[in-house]
Amino acid sequence: MQRWTVSEINQEQTHMPSVFDTRADSILSQLRDSGQFKLLQMIEGPMDASVRIRGYGDCLCFCSNNYLGLANHAEVVEAGIRGLRDFGAGTASVRFICGTFTPHEVLEKTIARMMGTESSYTFVSAWTAAEALFPTLCEPGDTIISDELNHACLIDAIRLATTIKKGVHKAVYKNNVLEGEKSLRAALEAARANKEATGQIWVVTDGVFSMEGSIADLPAMRKMCDEYNALLVVDDSHGHGVMGKLGRGTHEHFGMVDALDTPARSGAANRIDLFTGTLGKALGGGAGGFIAASKRATDLIIQRGRPTLFSNALPCTVACSANKAIEIMLREPQRVQRLKDNVAYARQQIGAAGFDVLKSPTAICPIIVHDTAKAIAMSKRLLELGVFVIGFGYPVVPEGHARLRVQISAAHTNQHIDQLVDALKKL
């Protein structure tokens, strides 16, 4: 057997680039040449209305999911510090072995109370929550019907479910906001007519669509789901802290949940059947996601969900911070109202400046510029002017629909918004 020295191996490798290396270099070159290469901006302090960015100094932040301004709230930070001191840095296990701590129990009760559900269960991310939901709860013969504009975590979770469990069917309907009820009803009719689809029908939607800022027509969807004996699943990651008087979500906005602390009625006609959501946006905990649903659903997730069985629990420090953030949101409805006032002012001022901003009551204010390279160039120029806004283009949004996504926070003031508009006028 021939023996190779390290220098001979290194020399051999320098003349034999892998297929991956060649392919990756080609893709990255195309992204750079087209102006679509994304640069990571290094933030050198806490998240707030203004952030310190390496190379740019202090900039107004209009691209954060920190909708209620809780990411650096003193009580939220202190709760995390106490959690770190009391429970340590890591859980060192999955939940069913020795990774379930009292902060998990407290947080999950708080989430269920907020959402108006029987139960909830937490994960290290909302992506993981979605990944646990469909492959665990769906069985062959089921049909999953998904909005075309749903978040990538839902899309990939549905793909995973249909791959793992052969015989799970999927369908996509035109966006509920743009196309109304016709496309969804057609998908429901097709599912009912499919002789191989004899199981449960699941209708899946974002509550607030992350790129459009629009909201799903949940009352109409609930009515259709009842007609076809379908379950309604809502990912409300951009609705928590934003929609409804208390910030409980899009279902509260539509009056589809009882007052806080009213006992949950499993299967009631005005309910959303299952939620997925995040703790890393308005709810200020820094990371983590959850499923909120009936106890039978969360019990099945605990018993059979692969992300539950084979992935570590949410760190206790994050659970403590998130619990405090929800507590603050529910006790301070004026914080949610301030966000709504800021959103209304921002949309009015941006529109008055001549920009095409999509209309919505949510904190996401997309300014349509159509071309991806243009959106990225505008984002760069805004940063030079001291305003942090991100440009989004293909493949995050369809070709020709590139945009600047302005995101408003309760931490912003009218003066901050005026500075944003002044910078936009200079583009």
Predicted regions span which residues?
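Conserved N-terminal alpha-helix of the aminotransferase class I/II PLP-enzyme fold
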Residues: 78-125
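N-terminal "arm"/small-domain region of PLP-dependent enzymes with the aminotransferase-like
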Residues: 22-89, 230
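PLP-dependent aminotransferase class I/II
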Residues: 283-350, 355-358
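Conserved PLP-binding catalytic core of the aspartate aminotransferase-like
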Residues: 337-344, 351-386, 396, 400-401, ...
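Conserved PLP-anchoring active-site segment centered on the Schiff-base-forming lysine
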Residues: 133-152
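PLP-dependent enzyme catalytic core of the Aspartate aminotransferase-like
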Residues: 1-4, 8-13, 74, 78-82, ...
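Active-site PLP attachment segment
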Residues: 246, 250-300
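Active-site phosphate-binding strand-loop segment of PLP-dependent enzymes
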Residues: 66, 168-234
